[in-house]
Amino acid sequence: MEQPHLAYRAFCQSREAAGQWRQLHAVQPLPRGRVLRDGVELINFSSNNYMGLADHPLLKQRAMAWTEQWGTGAQASRLVCGDLEPFARIEARLVAGKGCEAALVLNAGYQANSSVIPALLDKRVLGGEPLVFSDRLNHASMHHGVQLAGVRQLRYRHGDLDHLERLLKRHAGEKVAKFILSETVFSMDGDRIDVGGLIALKQRYGAFLYLDEAHATGVLGPDGFGLAAAYPGQVDLVMGTFSKGLGGFGAYVTCSHALRAYLINRAGGFIYSTALPPGVLGAMDAALELLPQMGEVRARVLAGAQRVRAALRAAGLDTGNSSTPIIPVMVGDEQRTLALSEGLRAEGLLGIAIRPPTVPEGTSRLRLSLSAAHSDEDWSLLAAAVPRCLREING
């Protein structure tokens, strides 16, 4: 019985020796985009709270009100007796905002991708093994979903639709189901995909298009409902989350009525999971209610991100192709990236170093993210501090 434990310890030791050791740090969220981390108050430039909704009074009030009305837990999966009345209300809001036929609320983003994707790729249902064309930098949960299905991925270069089309052409004669999988905003790079271009390829080659809008929901697209909302009815399935721009927790998919019915009967993560608690649903509902009223907030955050990027680029830093509140500062070397993160911490700023295996070798970076909870002065402070800290590291 000791052998597995020895193997686990050896794994941890190898990660630590490689400088890739991860550990938890207790935090306490504070108002105005601040956080107490290891007892130190920092301006938080590492969260996904893009719209500042995680501390919004309406979300907190509705979460408490729905907890009072329906209790602290759903008590069962939705298929058993946990399909509480609020689910239909939230799904109706999603349908209206996304311009789709149907919606289905799920428990979390990782769970959604890792259970919905295998359901879609089921070889027994499709009558054979499908072809999956996946952006190389898709989220780990999407790659995991394909692996669970036991299907081989054809990975195209990140954001390169010409490369994707060459792959689609090469396999055009194969009489099997074809799937294109992509995020719309990439979580570690902050860049956007050409949704219209993906739709054109989907239509040209008869493929099923699956888009992950986790980091676009709340921030981009019509009324903040994501980039795919500008193309109603043209994407087969859109996945998104409530845990980032919407300030809460949970996930959703939008699709056709027929596909929703299929997932209810086939997606294991939906079938076998206890439904989300009423308090979480209350925060979801409030966020969706607020979204159409938040155009000025979205514009401010995007404009602030553009100013910070411009300042960093003017200082000679590489921020990739970011066009969202996610701003990577590409460093490359892991130890220098960690040193930059520590330098910012000494100045009262939280910017987390992102290293392999989260990102490819040689692309370690600081992943910065802006929030509507920040002031313009916070953003100016960040734009000045990053180049200064990096100069000190470089000597």
Swiss-Prot record:
Pyridoxal 5'-phosphate binds at G109, Y110, S187, D212, E213, A214, H215, T241, F242, S243, K244. It holds the Pfam family Aminotran_1_2. Keywords: Biotin biosynthesis, Pyridoxal phosphate, Transferase. It is an enzyme of class 2 (transferase). Pathway: Cofactor biosynthesis; biotin biosynthesis. Substrate binds at R22, H139, T358. The keyword Cell inner membrane does not apply. Belongs to the class-II pyridoxal-phosphate-dependent aminotransferase family. BioF subfamily. Homodimer. This is Putative 8-amino-7-oxononanoate synthase. It comes from Magnetococcus marinus (strain ATCC BAA-1437 / JCM 17883 / MC-1).
